[in-house]
């Protein structure tokens, strides 16, 4: 803190004391029309600027009234670059007597996690092996080539068509994991190169939208398994998840579907329909409504390429049915892999945990093997990925032992399962939540 005024000619202008705030005051500013947050004890008013936030206003708004230091560091690999956007938003700092953390968060866990991240940086675990990602892209292109050659050489009979569909579904699933890498800025040092290649992979190779994915997925990472903040647990009344939601639905006598049978109808409307119906419709509408013309152009380039390639073999209607069959196959792969790490964990309302604890509560791992790594796009290391979202996936296994040690030190459970058990736990979790709903519906 400096003092005001000058002391004669040539004297340096002294700093004006910065306003200080208590957590009680900061936590009042957590509304859509009034948003403050804290980063490294500095208080920022993001109310107006949040609409310009590249990651979307929702993800940054989820931290209104809270300390966002670790989330800010996790999402932004170039802190110096993004820091310049914060300067005009600075309105003060935490009062000296205030702790650095809000809601009584465990400062020791926070300190140890930050030390762990520094260790990861010292081990060069945020450094990319570009050959690894080039090989991933090459094998996706190779799969697409094999698919075309199969139908070209063997014709459009049922067997060649099924083989081609499964090969293309595999390439789509793998492209989904690859776009995830670029979307998290985990490949190139410069964000703009990640953004450009992300649009190519998700747009031209998959026909989807980078902006749609960013705004949805970053919310999931910021507040995993938190109702009204994580869009991945917004099931549109089709399923009830965790323990809190089914009991609330039961008490309120909400019965949009027979939730006590959700572990059974999951097989009919979960894996088969998410991508070909819900995501495909939502992505197209989002690009049009929000005027994401660049994303739309990339997506159109995918559809042009697909139909130019396969209409000669199947005709227009046949190619359209073929496309949706591929989406149908890919959807099964995507749903089972993405749900095995989260849906089985705690799903609840906001509990205001520190970054490390919140990610461990909402995520679990699947055992490592060459197949598991490839099949899941290394999302079998979901814990490490959530803790360090910008870390290249080929390094996640290297930091895992240190994460386990930190969990053991603080008595936090580190869950790791065989692949088959992880998949079966999805059904067990849905069955458990369904029973909770039925009990509350009948007796509370």
Swiss-Prot record:
Its main location: endoplasmic reticulum. Signal peptide: none annotated. It is a multi-pass membrane protein. Its EC number is 1.14.19.3. Pathway: Lipid metabolism; polyunsaturated fatty acid biosynthesis. Residues 1-131, 179-264, 327-444 are cytoplasmic. The chain crosses the membrane at residues 132-152, 158-178, 265-285, 306-326. It is found in: Endoplasmic reticulum membrane. One of its GO terms (cellular component) is endoplasmic reticulum membrane. Pfam families: Cyt-b5, FA_desaturase. Involved in the biosynthesis of highly unsaturated fatty acids (HUFA) from the essential polyunsaturated fatty acids (PUFA) linoleic acid (LA) (18:2n-6) and alpha-linolenic acid (ALA) (18:3n-3) precursors, acting as a fatty acyl-coenzyme A (CoA) desaturase that introduces a cis double bond at carbon 6 of the fatty acyl chain. Catalyzes the first and rate limiting step in this pathway which is the desaturation of LA (18:2n-6) and ALA (18:3n-3) into gamma-linoleate (GLA) (18:3n-6) and stearidonate (18:4n-3), respectively. This is Acyl-CoA 6-desaturase. It comes from Papio anubis (Olive baboon). The gene is FADS2.
């Amino acid at each position: 803190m400096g003092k005001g005024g000058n002391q004669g000619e040539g004297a340096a202008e002294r700093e004006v004391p910065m306003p200080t705030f208590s957590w009680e005051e900061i936590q009042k500013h957590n509304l859509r029309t009034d948003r403050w947050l804290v980063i490294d004890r500095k208080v920022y008013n993001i109310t107006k600027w949040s609409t310009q936030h590249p990651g979307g206003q929702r993800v940054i708004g989820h931290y209104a009234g809270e300390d966002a230091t670790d989330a800010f560091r996790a999402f932004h690999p170039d802190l110096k670059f993004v820091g310049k956007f914060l300067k005009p938003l600075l309105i003060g700092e935490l009062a000296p007597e205030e702790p650095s953390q809000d809601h009584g968060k465990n400062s020791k866990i926070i300190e140890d996690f930050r030390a762990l991240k520094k260790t990861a940086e010292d081990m060069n675990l945020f450094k990319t092996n570009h050959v690894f990602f080039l090989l991933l892209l090459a094998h996706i292109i190779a799969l697409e080539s094999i698919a075309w050659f199969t139908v070209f050489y063997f014709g459009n009979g049922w067997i060649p068509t099924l083989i081609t569909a499964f090969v293309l579904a595999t390439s789509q699933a793998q492209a989904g994991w690859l776009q995830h890498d670029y979307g998290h800025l985990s490949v190139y040092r410069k964000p703009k190169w990640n953004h450009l290649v992300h649009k190519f992979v998700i747009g031209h190779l998959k026909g989807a939208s980078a902006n749609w994915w960013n705004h949805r997925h970053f919310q999931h990472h910021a507040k995993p398994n938190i109702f009204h903040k994580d869009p991945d647990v917004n099931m549109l009344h089709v399923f009830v998840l965790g323990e809190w939601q089914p009991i609330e639905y039961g008490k309120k006598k909400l019965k949009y579907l027979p939730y006590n049978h959700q572990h059974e109808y999951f097989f009919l409307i979960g894996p088969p329909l998410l991508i070909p119906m819900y995501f495909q419709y939502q992505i197209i509408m989002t690009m049009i409504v929000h005027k994401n013309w660049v994303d739309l152009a990339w997506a159109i380039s995918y559809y042009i390429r697909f139909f130019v390639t396969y209409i000669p073999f199947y005709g227009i209607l046949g190619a359209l049915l073929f496309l949706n069959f591929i989406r149908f196959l890919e959807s099964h792969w995507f749903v089972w892999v993405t749900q095995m790490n989260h849906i089985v964990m705690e799903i609840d309302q906001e509990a205001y945990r520190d970054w490390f604890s919140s990610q461990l509560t909402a995520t679990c791992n699947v055992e490592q093997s060459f197949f598991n790594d490839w099949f899941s796009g290394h999302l079998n290391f979901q814990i490490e990925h959530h803790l360090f979202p910008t870390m290249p996936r080929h390094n996640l296994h290297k930091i895992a032992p240190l994460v386990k040690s930190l969990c053991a030190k603080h008595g936090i459970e580190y869950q790791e399962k065989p692949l088959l058990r992880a998949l079966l736990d999805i059904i067990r979790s849905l069955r458990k939540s369904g029973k909770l709903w039925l009990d509350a519906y009948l007796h509370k």
